[in-house]
Amino acid sequence: MLRKTILFILTSLLFCGKINGQSLNWDSLNKRRLEINRQHLYILGAWGAANLIQGSISASNSNGSARYFHQMNAYWNGVNVAIAGLGLLGLKYQLKQSFGPAQMIQEQRVLEKFLLLNTGLDAAYITTGLFLRERGLRLNNDRNKGFGNSLIFQGSFLLVLDLVHYFAHQKNGKALQDQVNKLQWNVGTNGAGLTYRF
């Protein structure tokens, strides 16, 4: 089951960068941003659910560091499932909102910064996992070894997931900025106007 879930997640990641061949406009860029978020949260939720189930079952059937590895996977992914669920509820609210260009740019920038912050946290998870594993090996402590291996595993997945989605959002943000750059204020003797260059 875990292999099928991983295959599903990897396949989904490949489709995150699909290109919309139609002319871009404000609504399609906002919908694209929300679609990238939705994909991210579904992948996180699927990963979390698979690891929560697998970790719970395997922890009771394992010994030594493997038991602690599966326990931490279950704990960690209980949080991931909750984050994904709350994020999807928030997306329903955002789908009902109407965004103007300035608000869309602000939302896009905040999201990109958030994903960069997450990649830093992911690297910290991996580093903490390496520390725990090393300490567990040095002190022959199964709990530290298992928890460390789990943090390395989960942190690595989250790092890849967040980076893939950061670059997808960055691409969408560039298209949004290109649209903004096509807007031009004109001031003349008869008044002011906003021009959109095609």
Q: Where are the language model's segments positioned?
A:
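Long, highly hydrophobic alpha-helical transmembrane signal-anchor segments
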Residues: 46-69
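Amphipathic, well-ordered alpha-helical segments in soluble domains
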Residues: 48, 52-55, 126-129, 159
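Loop-to-helix transition at the N-terminal end of transmembrane alpha-helices
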Residues: 64-80
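Canonical alpha-helical transmembrane segments
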Residues: 54-58, 79-94
